[in-house]
Amino acid sequence: MNTQQRHSWGLAFGLCLITLAVNLQAPLYTTYAQLSGYGAAATAVAFSGYVLGVLPVLLAFGGLADRVGRKPLILAALGLSMLATVVTMLWPNLIALGVARLLMGVGTGLASATSTAYMMELMPTCDARSPANRVTASTSLGFGLGAALTSLFLLALPSVTPGSFWLQLMLAALALVVVWRLPDPAERIKHAPLLRLPVFPSGSLPYSFSMLLAWATSGLVIAILPSVLAAHDLQQWSGLSTFTVISCGLVFQPWVRRMHPARATGLGLLVLPLSYALLAWGASEGSLPAVLLGALGASSACYGFLYLGGLSAITAMAGAQKARVTAGFFLFAYVGFSIPVVVTGLLADHFGADVALIVFGLALLAGASITGLLIVRTAAFIAQPSHG
């Protein structure tokens, strides 16, 4: 392995450990809520602390890496991931979870603002997709792996501070050393603008809204599903469902890359409501195979068809404003990761989990149908020959 490859894998290791901490506590959400005396809505609010951390950093400090360099932001993100884990180890309750999610949101925002650019500088190549694919793979694996590890430790020994927390701290400390030794070749620009407001090119909104639907579904699986599974004594498996709904989407990405963006997004909007229906039915009936199969289908849509298809489409529309257009795309995604999840939690507290899951499913079906129709019409209009 040459030096460039070694450096790129070192950065990928650091990025994986940053995102591994994000959903590390997911299988314990219901336990934290019970210990704190709160319900599904409060759990969803604590879960959304992540978005409150990540969005301001992405928007208000998007140009920070140009001023201070790439490596300091990755090191800061690793430190915040460790601090967030320590907070929930010392105070295993819902308020501490909200604080930890906020810290992890800030850390992920710092890493997201520079990770792809840093990877491209460490592994120079004619094909810009290779660095981006390595960043996507390492972060997607981390997002799901943390929850899966906690589930495995809980199956072996129930605890509010499982061994996965200690494992994350040890691996993140190792990642700090690895990233510290990486070069940082980017030129510093002292007066680079920090603020990068989002831009939405004509025709991009349906693709952005499809990401809102996708991440709302994955957020529901992470934040609300554990309490539904707990009613059937399946809470310890919620980490596996989180891993499935996030990380298994990687399997579908090579296929999606060969598809036209509009076709990929349209297929994702078809798969998502069907997969959610199976997942919600399995959770209500206590059928773990149905939950995992539905989560796998949702993952193919959320982190395969809709993510790559939508990102490819809006990037093609962006022109010279790629960074700001991408910020707008993820703004929709993070709104979906918070507001619909909180609303569903409120419905679950007042009307029961089954009603909340049905209402979310109907809204998802309506949103996917309308968005899919808009994408099909936009694609058909663009494909028409000009008669100017």
Label every PLM stretch briefly.
Residues 37, 69, 90-96, 282-286:
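Helix-breaking motifs and short loop linkers at transmembrane-helix boundaries and internal kinks
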Residues 45-62, 112, 116, 243-255:
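Central cavity-lining transmembrane alpha-helices of secondary-active solute carriers
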Residues 100-139:
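Cytoplasmic helix-loop-helix junction between adjacent transmembrane helices
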Residues 125-180:
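Helix-loop-helix hairpin linking two adjacent transmembrane segments in secondary transporters
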Residues 163-179, 357-374:
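Symmetry-related core transmembrane helices of the 12-TM Major Facilitator Superfamily/SLC fold
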